[in-house]
Amino acid sequence: RPELAVLRSADKNISLPGVRFACGEEGFEEACAYPAADIVLVAVSGFAGLKAALCALAAGKDVALANKESLVVGGGLVLSLAEKKGARILPVDSEHSAVWQCLHFDRKAPFSRILLTASGGALRDVPIEKLPCVTAKQALCHPNWKMGAKITIDCATMLNKGFEVMEAMHLYGAKLSQIKVLVHRESIVHSMVEFADGAVLAQMGVPSMELPIQLAFTWPERLSCDLPPVDFAKLGALHFEEVDKKRYPCFSLALSCAKKGGTYPCILNAAGEVAVQAFLRGQINTRKLQKL
């Protein structure tokens, strides 16, 4: 049982032996800076994750970061605070955990290119002319991963992959020109890193978040993880494709915002959060969602 549990609002009817309950903003901040914690896993969805990351870093805690929006909207703030407090940022996104592993857990190691992989999401095989008719239920059926509604929709439009490009720019000091995105339907290669001599290292594994989460807590050690091994003979082949810009206009928009910098990524994130909620409520169709 946890020592501390935080609720959105106070509830006198909830009690557990040995567990202290806090609530609201004060409880949220207390949990992020909990004195007994060595590492804070920030897995809050959306813009709210920025506050969690900043609270934890301000307390000198290492942050296992599963919330990419923290870097999309406040990358400079997050990284400068981490450096000031001597805290470490440990990537939890499967793609960025893969890059981190390929760089031997050194986010400042030199490289030539980062190759991020994308499954293509739930809409990858829907004819483009039929995309406006896609329902939220269809868009939530990710072919490889089980995730929350917001990120699953962002994967369907590949806005999520655009955010991951921005995340790579912050985490690894990469230029936009050093990041390549490839559609990889099998989701076995989680990302790759190319070095100056042309060598490419890839991190592979079955599509599961268990390993990235575990590794953020155990590195530099690798502990046993109850995941099935990759059956390469059964797979037979791995496939990679260029991103179809016509199918995924949100991805192109994200790259444009990454290039412009400033407040553009923050505005894009806000627009994305509002648009996805409207889509999930049935207020807009896929075409309007992709136009943000």
Give the role of each language-model region:
Residues 1-292:
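Catalytic, metal-anchored helix/loop core of enzyme active sites in primary metabolism
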